[in-house]
């Protein structure tokens, strides 16, 4: 194994997180000894459906066309979630353990947590999934309401369609916790929300992806230049401006989401890694490097160009064209 972390591998440089088959194998290796005798067929079926869905091979859906929230993004988070779930389970008394069914539902929810970015065939007004940035979690919840019964988990719909919102900003967390009765389900939600944050911030190319890809999605999603009383308000002026605000964002995520809202659940990883936490260490390295770049203003230090795992041809060129057109329309008032 190479010592240099590859751009589409996890924080340990051992699992190719652009590959559904590789991530499924890693999940199975974690789940089998933790819940011996439990059938992993639902997970196998879910991963197969995920692969077809994101490739645009499921009737009624277009494939993934978002450049930041691509296939690798989801799979990286899914692997982190599996590790968190298993790490948690191995440290609990029996009464607090999740059990195999809940662990499976949690992972399936994680696997499809960003499915709301996929355009449906009846989304006639949209040109790119990034346009659903503000509503993608609710769209994902509706997908789970349809898909979980097909997978044989219809009874879990009320839970899954709530805890998916721990990955977003559409529903206040206290509202979720008021509706979900079992504290073990809340814990799965906290593990899911934790995985969503730490895996992407630990990505080897997180900084370049924020500048080049996330900013473009934020433009199309109305986040970078939101409208206020019919007038555009600039939140992020450019990809570089987004990077300048990233240290503050990461600090806020760590303090408010990871530590407070999710009860420092990231520590459950440490039993799997001899007491260390490779995700948090990678986040620290990314932040240290970003501060170096910001001090020097030498943006050429961010020169990685990792592949995009989308279903469309040249998705970045398409995204840039849509972004430029959107910005022109915003400032022209059309």
Residue ranges and their predicted role:
Residues 51-80, 122-130:
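Active-site flanking loop/helix segments enriched in acidic
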Residues 2-37, 83-102, 112, 169-334:
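Divalent metal-dependent phosphate-bond-processing catalytic cores, especially two-metal-ion Mg2+/Mn2+ enzymes
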Residues 74, 81, 136-174, 232-233:
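Histidine- and acidic-residue-rich, metal-dependent catalytic cores
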Residues 77, 104-125, 140, 161-170:
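His-Asp-centered metal-binding catalytic motifs of divalent-metal-dependent phosphohydrolases/nucleases
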Residues 69-73, 98-107, 132-136, 183-190:
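Secondary-structure capping and boundary motifs in well-ordered enzyme cores
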Residues 88-96, 122-127, 147-159, 204:
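Inter-helical turn/loop segments and adjacent helix faces that build the functional surface
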Residues 46-50, 54, 106-110, 160-168, ...:
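Short alpha-helical scaffolding segments that buttress acidic/His motifs in well-ordered protein cores
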Residues 35-38, 42, 66-69, 183:
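Non-transmembrane, amphipathic alpha-helical segments
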